[in-house]
């Protein structure tokens, strides 16, 4: 059981800073724009970084609550996507047979 004053942010503040900087990087912005058609929204990473620093400085309960909620939203967003491919339980029976040769044209 954790002691009341021993709570730590889910991630170190350096991780929030690195994620925020990555989100703002040119390569990430271009990739995100290419894939999604819009610029990435990096405000949540900045809010998390600010809350993490506030927690480290003043042990603010509001910052703690905000960080916990933000991480829960991230976990739920990652879990909502279904797998594209059906996972195999075992390889196909003919996996070791030679591949069919291309037909002559």
UniProtKB/Swiss-Prot annotation:
Pfam families: PANTS-like (PF11326). In the postnatal brain, expressed diffusely throughout the hippocampus at a low level at 8 weeks (at protein level). At 16 weeks, strongly expressed in the stratum lucidum of the hippocampus (at protein level). In developing and aging brain, expression is strongest in hippocampus, especially in areas CA3 and CA2, throughout the dorsoventral axis. Rapidly degraded by proteolysis following neuronal stimulation, resulting in increased AMPA receptor clustering. Keywords: Secreted, Synapse. The keyword Secreted applies. GO terms for cellular component: synapse; synaptic cleft. It comes from the Eukaryota. InterPro entries: Pants/Emi1-like (IPR021475). It is found in: Synapse; Synaptic cleft. GO terms for biological process: negative regulation of long-term synaptic potentiation; regulation of synaptic plasticity. The keyword Transcription regulation does not apply. Negatively regulates long-term potentiation and modulates adult synaptic plasticity. Stabilizes the interaction of RTN4 isoform A/Nogo-A with its receptors, inhibiting clustering of postsynaptic AMPA receptors at synaptic sites. Upon neuronal stimulation, degraded at synapses, reducing RTN4 signaling and allowing AMPA receptor clustering at individual synapses. Interacts with RTN4 isoform A/Nogo-A; the interaction results in enhanced RTN4-mediated inhibition of AMPA receptor clustering. Also interacts with NCAM1, RANBP2 and CCT8. Belongs to the UPF0545 family. This is Synaptic plasticity regulator PANTS. It comes from Mus musculus. The lineage of its organism: Eukaryota, Metazoa, Chordata, Craniata, Vertebrata.
């Amino acid at each position: 059981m954790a002691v009341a004053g021993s709570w730590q942010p889910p991630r170190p503040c350096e991780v929030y800073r690195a994620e925020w900087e990555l989100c703002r990087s040119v390569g990430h912005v271009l990739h995100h724009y290419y894939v999604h058609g819009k610029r990435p929204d990096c405000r949540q990473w900045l809010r998390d970084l600010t809350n993490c620093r506030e927690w480290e400085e003043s042990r603010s309960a509001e910052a703690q609550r905000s960080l916990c909620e933000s991480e829960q939203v991230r976990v739920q967003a990652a879990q909502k996507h279904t797998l594209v491919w059906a996972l195999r339980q075992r390889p196909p029976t003919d996996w070791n047979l030679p591949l069919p040769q291309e037909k002559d044209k």
